[in-house]
Amino acid sequence: MKNRLIILALGLSPPGTMGGNSKITVEMARCLAGKREVRFILPENKLATLTNNVPPDHGIHIHALPAFTGEDKLNPIAATRWFTPRLRSVLREISAGPDDFLYCCSDFHIDVLPPYTLQKEFGFRWLPSIFLFVPFVFENLSRGYKFPAIKYIIYWLYQRALFALMKHRATGFVVTNRSDFTRFPKRFTGKLFDYYGGVNIEQIPSAPLPKRRDVVFCSRLHPQKGIDAFLDTWKLIVQAISAKDLSNVSNPKLTIIGNGSPSYESYLKDKAQRLGIANTIEWLGYVNNEAKFRIYAESRVFVHPTVFDNNGMVAAEALCTGLPVVMQDLPALRDVYTTGCLKVPFGDRNAFAAAVVSLLTDPAEYAATAPTPDQLTALRAHWKWESRAAEFDRWLDTL
């Protein structure tokens, strides 16, 4: 009998959004529910994020806690006091103990402080996750990420403090890139798992669709994802193609999938107006599952202009749908994406624009870059969620 997996997902994305950590957590539960007993603990106001993304016969034991009525990110002490006794009640109800793994879906305080407080009481094997280490202010400024400096100093200090607590009582850690292993003490050797995410292969259209879209971007709308600078790049792309006067791509269109804070979305749309490219962009907001893969299948090129990342599952989704991907050459992604991509120097908008233009206008370049049928088969086998979950399941058995 395999050890039970308890998933604590108080920091799960709310319905209508889906962060990478939440996607990994939901798919982990879906894929492992048939292999070991899975208990999923989350706030009741986030229940739909789970149930809308797993089949009705998922086999997951769900425990929905009363939601914290305030803003949990702004009230860490109150939120922790709210969730800790409620988590304790569930752990007592299910007789949690030393044979159980307790995995946390985020490194937010609501997913760290309650299990840290309760770990000695119940003795469970704690598996925190850190899916992205916050860059220190010098990296932020030197690399031109344009993240708010003061805000990100606070984020960095906040994460470092919680990381210290995690290291004190954790059995192991889950990260999303092997390059992060160097951040951990040697005593965690063999106790780190790089969960790179996956792709819902079954949601990809089985037959080719007409390519009625030119370029597609999909991500949370946030400065980290590079969408701000890409609007400038998109203007260069539109101008370059217009100058070529090509009949097949005379009026290129950009499809943007994703949402963000209302203020940032307004900023981006206002910028598109100022740049004179608003009529070339379709803003679709949050789209997920089959509808998202249909949009991919209708598109010719996927762009991944993220400025700070260590995984980027949307690029894998696009590649598994057969699209070529243009991305910045980030060190953390060099070993993750080696097929079907054109990589350009970081921050070089002209090079990024030239790569997209070449794929849209040069059939030979497109054919040489897009995944071949054999590569597509290999990509899908590598990235399907079931493969990722099986690797994680085997790792659990070694702890």
Locate predicted features.
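Conserved donor-binding/catalytic core segment of Leloir-type glycosyltransferases
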Residues: P208-K225, L231-L236, T255
